[in-house]
Design a protein with these regions (language model features):
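Solvent-exposed, non-transmembrane amphipathic alpha-helical segments
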Residues: 45, 59, 70-73, 87, ...
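Hydrophobic protein-protein interaction segments
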Residues: 109-304
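Short alpha-helical interface elements
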Residues: 50-54, 64, 68, 75-78, ...
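Basic, Lys/Arg-rich alpha-helical nucleic-acid-recognition elements, primarily the DNA-binding modules
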Residues: 1-93
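Generic preference for well-ordered secondary structure
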Residues: 9, 23, 34, 51, ...
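Charged, helix-prone or intrinsically disordered regulatory segments positioned adjacent to compact structured domains
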Residues: 73-76, 80-134
């Protein structure tokens, strides 16, 4: 393909997407560790009404107003006129899972590689990296619970991807892969030499897996290796019939991960989606694909 799999036309997100509102409520509830009855009490409605809300069956406008206040956003934002903001990794990755579950195609850049393309072993290493990523004084029960919940959502995403095999286009930065191989799968610097060696070998296996994808020309998976500068934040476009979302995130699942600090955004703005499409198409056009991309990564592996 000469262009990334972003479709020739630009789907427009629904102006008032009630299903998305319900999904945001569920993501908020999970992030806040609230039961449905807790939210029902705060909104002064029945638990049955909460289930209807989460299914996208909106009831009354005053309920929407109370829901907007609960989520800490304006009513316009809740109705999808503006942008979703997520200061919680739990709510953000839950929204990603929801959007992926009904997408036909996703186009993404993650640093260093998309979690959906990693091995099953990576899930185990990611837990180690997250445990290492913060000082012991901050490693309380709440942080441990956050790790468990994020990893649970990520595993659901990966399982769903393996079942439905939606079309994926992944942009991978060559410089980011070089840094990935240099550090290995570590949550912080300064680990013992033996541990560092083990983590570097694990990183090599993940990169070798990407090489296999490139050489095999796997159906439904397009990968472009980009030598140009890549954005510092990760992004992903979710596409389905008649709608497109773009998500931008500071949360990081590679070496030196970050789940604690940052604000992610999700929007259906035609301007925002269009700008990201244009950037993706430019990066994709200049990227190395197939055996050419595999050779570039092979050269890096030979150096490490």
């Amino acid at each position: 393909l000469n262009r990334a799999a972003t479709t020739s036309r630009a789907p427009r997100g629904a102006r008032f997407n009630f299903r998305a509102i319900g999904e945001r409520l569920r993501a908020y509830r999970l992030a806040a560790e609230l039961r449905s009855e807790d939210v029902a009490e705060q909104l002064d409605i029945s638990r049955a009404a909460i289930y209807k809300l989460e299914r996208g069956e909106i009831v009354k406008i005053d309920t929407l107003e109370r829901l907007a206040a609960l989520l800490g956003v304006s009513l316009a934002n809740l109705l999808g006129v503006e942008v979703e903001y997520h200061d919680s990794a739990v709510s953000y990755f839950e929204r990603m899972r929801q959007l992926e579950s009904r997408s036909e195609r996703i186009v993404a850049h993650f640093d260093p590689i998309s979690f959906l393309l990693t091995s099953e072993d990576y899930d185990v290493w990611l837990r180690h990296m997250l445990d290492e990523s913060i000082p012991p004084t901050l490693a309380d029960r709440h942080w441990a619970n956050t790790i468990d919940r994020v990893l649970g959502i990520l595993q659901e995403r990966k399982s769903s991807f393996s079942r439905q095999r939606l079309a994926v286009t992944s942009l991978i930065g060559l410089r980011q892969i070089e840094q990935f191989l240099h550090h290995g799968l570590v949550g912080r610097l300064g680990l013992p030499p033996g541990v560092q060696l083990e983590r570097k070998m694990a990183a090599r296996r993940e990169v070798a897996r990407i090489v296999e994808f490139l050489e095999a020309d796997t159906t439904g998976v397009q990968i472009g290796i980009v030598s140009d500068n890549m954005p510092n934040e990760t992004f992903q476009i979710f596409e389905a019939q008649g709608e497109a979302y773009v998500a931008v995130s500071p949360f990081r699942l590679g070496e030196l991960p970050n789940l604690r600090t940052g604000i992610a955004t999700i929007t259906t703005s035609p301007d925002g989606v269009g700008m990201y499409r244009a950037m993706i198409d430019r990066l994709w056009a200049d990227s190395a694909k197939g055996k050419e991309g595999a050779a570039l990564l092979g050269q890096l592996l030979a150096r490490f």
